[in-house]
């Protein structure tokens, strides 16, 4: 973009970087004439004012000179000591003269501006340069190989860098080295460049391209690499720029070719060594990257040659070009538009002529009628890459999850200047709240382990506040036996101490009541008792003594009973009793204030009369403890809690602990807490927290805590979450169910807590604390961000695919054979489509299995193995280690207790659910044994509806035997395995649908193979002979598959269609550690009706352990596809035609594994120097192909693939120790035969990477 313009045919020089404002000096060129053909010469200084919209630059000073100039430079000498405020202008003249000008005096308009001058050179001085380290040193070059070094402090006596070069020739340019101050280079038109060392005062090297003689027009040193320089060629036959390195001076390092005619001038940017300007006879100004020989930018210029070009030292984006058309143009390489400059030029032309006829008629010209043309705005493309001065050398930015992303541009070393600069981005985890994270980790550990008693006890011992200690004591009680009794002890009521007081009172150790002691003293003595339970004992003490210690002597036998029927009270009572009117007798006793007699009679009168009498008694009796006794007897504690003095809150809470029913306990404690919270006494308000803990009302606890505590600080919020989580687990333990939905206030606090955890990098923990049953926008947004950060976003959004139906295949079996019955755990049932047949349940987490369609299996989907299951299901749901959801799960999750979470179960990929495949008519199915229902009509569980979304489970294993006890049992026993005699199940949930166990040796007398005989031609006896007569070696669960001996071919039925080739893994190993234990029961096998054979179906079934063989067990006939293998006895099928097998591509979601592992091996190979280490790495690179094959075939379980993805992430973070920990976890929790081919290789690679520090 053109910024400014000077109408001069002149040599130019920019003011030094130390000078402000920016000036440009223009001296009349020696070998050129302007349009006026004037022979006058001048030296002018112009100011660069970019704020001025005018195109012309403002002239600040001018000096008429008798000299014309070949070269002009502006040095900073004298600026620092203010001797020369604007520096010194150094001019090279036509007659060998060098003139020093005071730039500040030229600007000021003084007439005496010359500091000094010399005519030592012979001929014109065409080369000048100022030393960048010592600004008082100036090099000049003239004719006859003259080179002088001038000291501006002593200008009269210059020195030479060494003897003149031979043969003598003109010096076209000189340049000081930008890195080493005593190195000077000079060049001559013949194309030779000489490098001088001023310390040695001698020439050290000559640079010349002997193969191509070029006319040198420019010389420039690399601003950063001391040994590199460029030479420009003016020859039209070779318009190139050669880049030389003095260390390899035999030939050019690079040749920059793009000009079509000779190059007149070059300039290397000091601010960015990757910017080199050149101008040539082809009217072009190019900006190069000399390191790559690429043209980064071409300036829009006129149709005239530019003979000089220079960078502005102060503003690195500005440059100037002097052209033969009499203009010095100022450009910016940052792009922009030239429309403004063009408009200004048009306006200037119009103002010059005005509206008067230029032919002298004096008449005003009419306006020019031109068609309106809307020309598009001309926009100049900026540089292809940002220049160095606007590139940030360093940068930092915070990212979600407490990550700090920093970058720095590493400067290339002098030894490797041609290499592209490395751009390093560091991603660091920043933890600012270390105490908060430490306590959060402790809580997380407790949630996983379930040791809440230990956690609460640790809190009691470590907290400093006495009230906090009391709170944690109350929370701890929830996890102990007989919680109410422990609550009473915390309130100060211990049974042992109370028993001692009562015993002392009964023995008469208490102060006896004197006859003259009035009622007031008695009450005062009772008030001295601290325990509320002692008060009714003291009131009832005379009754106790009268009834228990006083023996009533029997009436003398001679005394007759006198039943008075007089009209006094006794007589009326007697009459009422004689007639059986208990109620009247009780009323008379109460009227006569004979309370004891009335209550005794009411007991005999029945419960209704007793309750009525109790009410009347309490209405008449007014004492300190009458309300308490009334509440105890009437079991009505609501009135006590609503009216009691809040100073006696402990006594009221103790009474609730003792007498409240379980269903009303929580409400009563909450009522007392609400009264305490609304109290004006601050100390009483704090006690409301204890009541809410006893009540188990989490929302009230959160509301109270929010009002009284500073919940803005992370530690305060951590304290609240600790109490809430522990209390929720306590309520869950007490009620045996998941608590109610989370309220708005608690959801807000949990969202705030999850945000804090996420800001410290604990993303997995943070998402577990987010509520799942709230519609708050902030919660949903945070869940979205966390899901994306953890790679679970696609998994959360993908709906469940429709599950196709399967066809049943019935098989005949003897009725009297005892069977093992496998009870399959049933997931939560989802209504199925009416038209879809029943399918067996799936025993794996939704969204973690995928289908694999091979080219040989009639497009039969093969389910991936499921997530590993625990060996021994937990019998205690409360003891299970669950992820820290602390009762916040959805109801769908609540019915399936969780097992121990997989350590590295981050959702790396979302697999679609498994779809069952139904073979079409005439399609041979791959045989797989099916489970037999206990009765013919017992249907299998319905499949999930295609319209319902897949349940979203957290990354944990949802299998538990105790939770599925009600599942309908299914009997299963395929034909006996080779030499085993037990029930063997070929597969498991998500296991491959085809398999080929090694055939055993044939027993003597066996003549036929039942696998190759149609079902219609088999007999029970024949099948029994062939199936039970086979013996063979029994392999261990982890033995590799044995090589099968070639079997003798038998005759195949005429219309037999061979099954599809077997492409999936052979079979699950025996004793699969993933198989759930404790789920087999023995039941007698029921008779299955014989039905016609149907096509084979593909049903995932559970693997069974081998049992002892009973040779006497009879065998039945089994219908199936012709040639379908029976049990384990599967013989080779027809020979498959040989064809070329091409490997399938690795799935796109797993390509990151290959890229990461191979990239790490390449880094290790680069860093390794030991041949033995390199051999190990080469071998590892080859053996990893086994892993890639398994990825292609998708035969690895999701748990192993998840671990591999976590390992790849640790490699990308260069955390090899974590990668080795993940490796150990995968090996210890997976099938050995599944991982033995590649896991040792990965361990070698990780160990070497950690050792080499790559």
From Swiss-Prot:
Annotated GO MF terms: structural molecule activity
Location in the cell: Cytoplasm; Cytoplasmic vesicle, COPII-coated vesicle membrane; Endoplasmic reticulum membrane
Keywords: Cytoplasm, Cytoplasmic vesicle, Endoplasmic reticulum, ER-Golgi transport, Membrane, Protein transport, Repeat, Transport, WD repeat
InterPro entries: SEC31-like, WD40/YVTN_repeat-like_dom_sf, WD40_repeat_dom_sf, WD40_rpt
Chief location bin: cytoplasm
PANTHER family on file: PROTEIN TRANSPORT PROTEIN SEC31A, SEC31-RELATED PROTEIN
Subunit structure: COPII is composed of at least 5 proteins: the SEC23/24 complex, the SEC13/31 complex and SAR1. SEC13 and SEC31 make a 2:2 tetramer that forms the edge element of the COPII outer coat. The tetramer self-assembles in multiple copies to form the complete polyhedral cage. Interacts (via WD 8) with SEC13.
Protein name: Protein transport protein Sec31A
């Amino acid at each position: 973009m053109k910024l400014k313009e000077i109408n001069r045919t002149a040599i130019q020089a920019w003011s030094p970087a130390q000078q402000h404002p920016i000036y440009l000096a223009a001296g009349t060129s020696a070998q050129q004439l302007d349009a006026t053909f004037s022979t006058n010469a001048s030296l002018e200084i112009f100011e660069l004012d970019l704020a001025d919209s005018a195109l012309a630059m403002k002239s600040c000073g001018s000096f008429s000179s008798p000299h014309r100039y070949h070269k002009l430079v502006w040095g900073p000498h004298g600026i620092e000591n203010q001797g020369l405020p604007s520096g010194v202008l150094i001019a090279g003249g036509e007659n060998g003269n060098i003139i020093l000008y005071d730039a500040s005096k030229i600007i000021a308009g003084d007439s005496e501006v010359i500091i000094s001058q010399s005519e030592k050179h012979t001929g014109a001085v065409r080369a000048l340069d100022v030393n960048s380290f010592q600004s008082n040193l100036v090099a000049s070059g003239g004719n006859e190989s003259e080179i002088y070094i001038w000291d501006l402090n002593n200008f009269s006596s210059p020195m030479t860098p060494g003897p003149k070069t031979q043969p003598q020739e003109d010096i076209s340019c000189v340049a000081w080295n930008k890195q080493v101050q005593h190195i000077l280079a000079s060049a001559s038109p013949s194309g030779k460049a000489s490098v001088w060392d001023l310390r040695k005062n001698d020439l050290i090297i000559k640079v010349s391209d002997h193969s191509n003689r070029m006319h040198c027009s420019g010389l420039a040193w690399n601003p950063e690499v001391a040994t590199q320089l460029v030479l420009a060629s003016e020859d039209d036959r070779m318009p190139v720029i050669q880049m030389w390195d003095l260390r390899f001076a035999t030939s050019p390092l690079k040749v920059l070719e793009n000009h079509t005619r000779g190059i007149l001038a070059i300039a290397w940017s000091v601010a960015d060594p990757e910017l080199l300007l050149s101008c040539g006879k082809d009217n072009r100004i190019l900006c190069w990257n000399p390191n790559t020989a690429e043209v980064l930018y071409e300036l829009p210029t006129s149709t005239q040659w530019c003979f000089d070009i220079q960078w502005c030292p102060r503003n690195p984006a500005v440059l100037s070009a002097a052209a033969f058309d009499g203009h010095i143009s100022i450009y910016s390489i940052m792009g922009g538009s030239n429309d403004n400059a063009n408009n200004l030029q048009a306006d200037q032309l119009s103002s010059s002529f005005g509206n008067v006829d230029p032919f002298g008629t004096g008449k005003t010209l009419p306006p020019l009628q031109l068609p309106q043309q809307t020309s598009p705005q001309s926009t100049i493309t900026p540089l292809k890459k940002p220049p160095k001065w606007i590139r940030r050398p360093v940068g930092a930015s915070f990212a979600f999850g407490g990550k700090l992303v920093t970058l720095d541009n590493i400067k290339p070393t002098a030894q490797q200047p041609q290499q592209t600069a490395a751009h390093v981005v560091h991603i660091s985890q920043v933890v600012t709240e270390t105490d908060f994270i430490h306590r959060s980790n402790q809580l997380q550990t407790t949630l996983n382990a379930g040791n809440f008693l230990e956690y609460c006890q640790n809190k009691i011992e470590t907290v400093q506040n006495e009230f906090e200690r009391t709170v944690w004591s109350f929370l701890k009680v929830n996890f102990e036996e007989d919680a109410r009794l422990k609550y009473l002890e915390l309130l100060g009521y211990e049974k042992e101490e109370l028993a001692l007081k009562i015993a002392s009172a009964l023995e008469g150790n208490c102060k006896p009541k004197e006859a003259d002691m009035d009622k007031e003293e008695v009450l005062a003595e009772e008030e001295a008792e601290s325990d509320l339970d002692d008060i009714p004992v003291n009131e009832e003490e005379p009754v106790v003594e009268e009834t228990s210690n006083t023996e009533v002597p029997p009436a003398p036998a001679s005394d007759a009973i006198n039943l008075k029927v007089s009209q006094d009270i006794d007589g009326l009572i007697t009459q009422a009793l004689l007639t059986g009117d208990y109620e009247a007798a009780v009323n008379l006793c109460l009227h006569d204030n004979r309370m004891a007699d009335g209550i005794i009679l009411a007991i005999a009168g029945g419960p209704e009369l007793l309750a009525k009498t109790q009410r009347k008694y309490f209405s008449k009796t007014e004492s300190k403890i009458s309300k308490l006794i009334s509440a105890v007897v009437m079991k009505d504690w609501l009135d006590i809690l609503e009216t009691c003095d809040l100073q006696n809150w402990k006594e009221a809470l103790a009474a609730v602990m003792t007498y409240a029913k379980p269903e009303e306990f929580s409400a009563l404690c909450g009522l007392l807490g609400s009264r305490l919270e609304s109290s004006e006494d601050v100390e009483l308000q704090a006690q409301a927290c204890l009541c809410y803990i006893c009540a188990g009302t989490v929302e009230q606890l959160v509301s109270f805590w929010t009002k009284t505590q500073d919940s803005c600080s992370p530690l305060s919020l951590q304290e609240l979450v600790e109490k809430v989580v522990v209390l929720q687990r306590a309520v869950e333990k007490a009620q045996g169910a998941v608590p109610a939905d989370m309220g708005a206030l608690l959801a807000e606090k949990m969202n705030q807590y999850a945000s804090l955890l996420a800001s410290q990098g604990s993303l997995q923990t943070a998402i577990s604390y987010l509520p799942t049953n709230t519609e708050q926008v902030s919660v949903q947004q945070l869940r979205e961000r966390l899901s994306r950060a953890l790679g679970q976003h696609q998994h959360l959004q993908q709906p469940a695919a429709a599950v196709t139906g399967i066809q049943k295949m019935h098989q005949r079996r003897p009725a009297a054979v005892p069977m093992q019955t496998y009870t399959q755990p049933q997931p939560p049932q989802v209504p199925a489509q009416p038209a879809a047949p029943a399918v067996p349940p799936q025993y794996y987490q939704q969204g973690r299995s995928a289908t694999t369609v091979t080219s040989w299996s009639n497009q039969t989907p093969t389910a991936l193995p499921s997530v590993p299951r625990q060996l021994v299901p937990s019998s205690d749901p409360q003891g299970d280690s669950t992820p820290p959801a602390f009762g916040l799960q959805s109801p769908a999750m609540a019915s399936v207790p969780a097992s121990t979470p997989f350590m590295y179960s981050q959702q790396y990929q979302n697999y679609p659910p498994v779809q069952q495949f139904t073979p079409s008519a005439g399609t041979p199915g791959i045989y797989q044994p099916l489970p037999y229902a206990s009765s013919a009509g017992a249907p299998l569980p319905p499949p999930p509806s295609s319209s319902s979304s897949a349940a979203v489970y957290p990354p944990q294993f949802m299998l538990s035997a105790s939770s599925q006890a009600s599942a309908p049992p299914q009997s299963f026993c395929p034909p006996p395995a080779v030499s085993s005699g037990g029930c063997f199940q070929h597969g498991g949930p998500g296991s491959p649908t085809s398999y080929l166990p090694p055939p055993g040796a044939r027993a003597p007398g066996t003549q036929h193979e039942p696998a190759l005989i149609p079902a219609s031609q088999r007999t029970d006896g024949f099948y029994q002979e062939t199936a039970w007569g086979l013996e063979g070696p029994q392999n261990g669960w982890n033995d590799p598959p044995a090589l099968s001996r070639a079997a003798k071919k038998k005759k195949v039925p005429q219309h037999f269609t061979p099954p599809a080739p077997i492409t999936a893994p052979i079979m699950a190993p025996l004793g699969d550690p993933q198989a759930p234990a404790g789920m087999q029961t023995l039941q007698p096998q029921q008779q299955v009706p014989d039905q016609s054979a149907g096509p084979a179906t593909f049903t995932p079934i559970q693997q069974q352990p081998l049992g002892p063989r009973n040779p006497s067990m009879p065998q039945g006939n089994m219908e199936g596809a012709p040639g379908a293998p029976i049990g384990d006895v599967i013989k080779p099928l027809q020979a498959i035609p040989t064809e070329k097998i091409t490997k399938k591509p690795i799935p796109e979601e797993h390509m990151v594994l290959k890229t990461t592992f191979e990239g790490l091996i390449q880094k290790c190979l680069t860093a390794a120097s030991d041949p033995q280490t390199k051999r190990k790495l080469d071998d590892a690179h080859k053996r990893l192909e086994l892993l890639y094959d398994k990825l292609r075939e998708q035969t690895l379980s999701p748990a192993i693939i998840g671990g591999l993805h976590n390992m790849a992430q640790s490699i990308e973070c260069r955390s090899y120790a974590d990668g080795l920990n993940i490796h150990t976890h995968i090996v210890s929790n997976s099938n050995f035969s599944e991982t033995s081919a590649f896991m040792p290789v990965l361990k070698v690679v990780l160990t070497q990477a950690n050792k080499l520090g790559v």
